[in-house]
Structure formats: structure tokens, C-alpha cells
Amino acid sequence: MKRFGTAAVIVVLALAGAASAKAQDVSQADRDRALQYLESTKKGVLDATKSLSDAQWNFKPAPERWSVAEVMEHLAAAEDMLRGMTQEQVMKSPAVPMRDAEEIKKSDEGVLAMVPDRSHKIQAPEPLKPTNRFGSPAAAQKHFVESRATTEDYLKGATGLRAHVADSPMGKLDAYEFVLLIAAHSERHTKQMLEVKADPNFPKS
């Protein structure tokens, strides 16, 4: 009898844990919002890099500034890295109690406002600096599109995204907010590509 009692307790605890994670899942509205943001920022990247010549891809406004090709490579590599961090580090951290709704709202909005803001300059970490790892701008662009599709598929199926939290330069973010960060990061660098294209010396063709 004692053995069956212990088993019952384990089952109850497991179900309670599952219910807790479910309670901390994102709403369908928030999930749709993030998917729409991932799609719109992907479109922004593709629009900014559409029909560029080799000269346009590789133009650098100054020796220390990145070309559109280098930004594209950075975006493709960062998509992989940020999603991997979300899946392998954030989501594998211990579940935490549900945060206050107002705190979540403020944190979500902070990601959407701060990450795309180009007035705050951030040095790219060494693993994400351009090295021509994809071989060509077109290959980097293709990799970005494929990686973004993987990110979207992950968001569609993942559960408990609000239950797992990790530190970031903006404070503690949950896994859902790390997905928002992925999209916001591509918005930030789309602005960077448009800055390069707006340079008066940018090749006409």
C-alpha cells in the first residue's frame, strides 16, 4: 500500500507541475503577436536586401562600419544563437512563480522599445562578428530565412514560455521575451542596413 501511495504522490506532483507550466504559458494573442512580429521583421530584412549588386552588398560607409552583407551574416548567425539560448538555457532553467501581469507587460514593452533603438550602440560579441561563414550574402540571407522559419515553428509549439526566466542586459526576461528579442534584434539591424544604404556614397547599382 505504501508503494502505491508514493506513486500516487509522484503522479500528483507531476500533474501539478504540468498545470503550473500551463498556467504560465503565453496567451494565444501574445503568441500571434510574436509570430506577426517575427514575420514583419523578416520581411523588413528581405526588403532591405532585395536585388542588391555585389558592390551594394559589400559597400562600407567607413572602414570600421559593417557592410549590408556583414549585417546580413550577423543576423543569420544571431538567429541561430539566440534561439539556441532560449531553448537550451532559458527553457531548461528551473520554473519560477508567475510574475505579475503588469511586470510582464512592462518587460515585454521594454524589449520592443529598447532592442531596436539604434541610439544605444552595442558591440557585437566575438562569435557573432562577420567572418564570411556562409560564403556569400545570398547564402547568409537564405540561412536567415530558414532559421527564422525554425524560430516560428518553435514558438508555435513551445509551452511554458512564461515559466522560465534568465538574466539579460535588460534584466530578467522570460523565454517568450527572448523570442521577442530575436525579432527586435532583426528590426535593429534592418535599421543599420538602411543607414548604410542611405549613405551618399552608396553605389547606385
List each model region and its residues.
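Bacterial N-terminal signal peptides
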Residues: A7-G17
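N-terminal targeting signals for Sec/Tat export/insertion, comprising classic cleavable signal peptides
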Residues: R31-F59, E187
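Hydrophobic alpha-helical core bundles mediating ligand binding, dimerization, or RNAP-core interactions
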Residues: K42-V45, F144, R148-T151
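Short, helix-capping/interhelical loops that line the mouth of catalytic, cofactor-
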Residues: A19-R33, M81-F144, H164, D199-S205
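Second-shell loop/turn segments in exported
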Residues: Q28-L35, Q56-E73, P130-Q141, A175-V179
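Short alpha-helical hairpin
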Residues: A48-A55, R118-P125, G157-V165
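Positively charged n-region of N-terminal signal peptides that target proteins for export
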Residues: M1-F4
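Short, contiguous alpha-helical
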Residues: F59-E109, A149, D153-S205
